[in-house]
Amino acid sequence: MVKKMEIARILLKIVMWILIVGFGCNFILQTISYSFYKGAKKMTNLVCMPQYIQMTDALTGYGHNLDRDSDKIILFFGGSNYVAYNSVGKYANRFACPFISVDYYGTQDSKGKMNLSSMQRSALDLYDWAKQQYPQSEIIIMGHSYGTGIATYLASERKCKTLILAAGYRDISDLYNKIIPIFWGPFKVFISNNICTKEYAKAVDSSVYIIGSKKDKTLNADLQKKLVTCFENAEIKIFDDIAHEDYFVTESVIGYIHQVIE
């Protein structure tokens, strides 16, 4: 009897520590991920000046070429530190059409609390605002790194012509495991606010293009080859020598994007 109780205590301690480690690591990694958007500073080495947009009373963003007459617009979701101001200021001048990015609720000047639900609502509200402003334009959704998940969510919920993902992931564990590699199999249950790109992908009916690079050490080319299988109809383009942050400043990538959106 004593031996059984001792075994039970040991098992309870193991379970307790698994719970502490699992939920604790999730909290730490989510806090870090969100801090890249909440605390991101405006970059100074921009190639164009972003224009401030008040989309709703609580939601803000930035854009470029907002008055440009075009049959298409781009909605862009940036990766870590690439809040709306930085995404537009670094990338928008490479496209001759309205280029718009949103700051998720609870980040930058957007009010509220940042979580999965509010990120999804930010994307939907961005789309609805853009559709009202440009009712005749086709919508192209682009995402990079962390932003590819919400970009895919939006494409699964709203009609768009094209979805372009650079350095994407299947769910947030692909990112978390780069830092603390514990979220495998059943241990994914500890992840809260999981951005499940592979689930959103099932409902995407637009053209999908996935871009990766053999030089990308953050979300590598092999991961992009796995991600493309999550979509019913997607093409993949793997470049040889592009670092993780350089996709949208590299001429070969920009040329490829222009080719697929024309």
Residue ranges, per PLM feature:
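Acidic catalytic loop of the alpha/beta-hydrolase fold
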Residues: K214-L219, H244-E245
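Catalytic histidine-centered segment of alpha/beta-hydrolase-like enzymes
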Residues: I242-S252
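Alpha/beta-hydrolase fold nucleophile elbow
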Residues: Y134-S145
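Membrane-embedded segments
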Residues: A58-W129, M142, G149
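Short alpha-helix in the alpha/beta-hydrolase fold that links the catalytic acid
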Residues: V88-G89, T197, S206, N220-T229
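Hydrolase active-site cap/lid region
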Residues: T148-Y200
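Short beta-strand/loop motif that positions the catalytic acidic residue
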Residues: V204, Y209-G212, D216
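An N-terminal hydrophobic leader/cap segment in hydrolases
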Residues: A8-H64
